[in-house]
Amino acid sequence: NKIRLQSAIQSKFGVDVIPGSYIYNKPLNYLKLKDKINSIKKRYDFVILDSSPNLNDEALSTILASDLLFVVTTPDYPTLSCSLKAAKLAKQRGRPVAGIIINKIRAPKFELSLENIEETLGIPVVARIPDDKNAVKALFTRIPQTIYKKKSPLAKEINNLSASLTFNKEKSSLISKLFGLDHKKEKVNRELLKESFYNSVFKD
């Protein structure tokens, strides 16, 4: 059954969310999502769309509705292949890809490195999010990981990325400062992203 967009919005933890359907299998109008997003854009500082990694109607609809894109990948060849196709499609459609987010890092020695991924996709990595068993628990309790385990490495990296998009300063530990870990490649990329973000999205 169809409902009004406003009626589908659910609010919790200071965020408005429109949940997706698990069983929706009807043909999509690629431009309809863009029209819907445009109708609510002015109410929010940011509207974030989470799409399927597969190149289907949902992904294309999301790409066309977005002003700026981030490609999420895991550090393995099968997923990277899908991410490469998604990045190429976005560029073909004239949508800028601001960065790569590497998710679920488990064993760095046996996974693709940041350098490998950047070289393959030609896009800077802006976040390296470690795998965390607490993410499963947070999902089960329906509490965001950044609230469920605020001090976990996963939560800290997500907050660091958020800081670059909201023009805030990242929080660094004393150990990171003492041992020069503040100059990680992904952090440098986030600083560059912060400088360019408002020029590309919020330009006059």
Where are these regions (language model features)?
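Broad hydrophobic/π-residue packing in well-ordered secondary structure
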Residues: 11, 43-46, 158-164
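Conserved catalytic-core segment of NTP-binding enzymes
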Residues: 35, 39-42, 46, 51-131, ...
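Generic hydrophobic alpha-helical segments
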Residues: 33-37, 83, 157, 161, ...
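Short, flexible micro-motifs
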Residues: 23, 57, 145
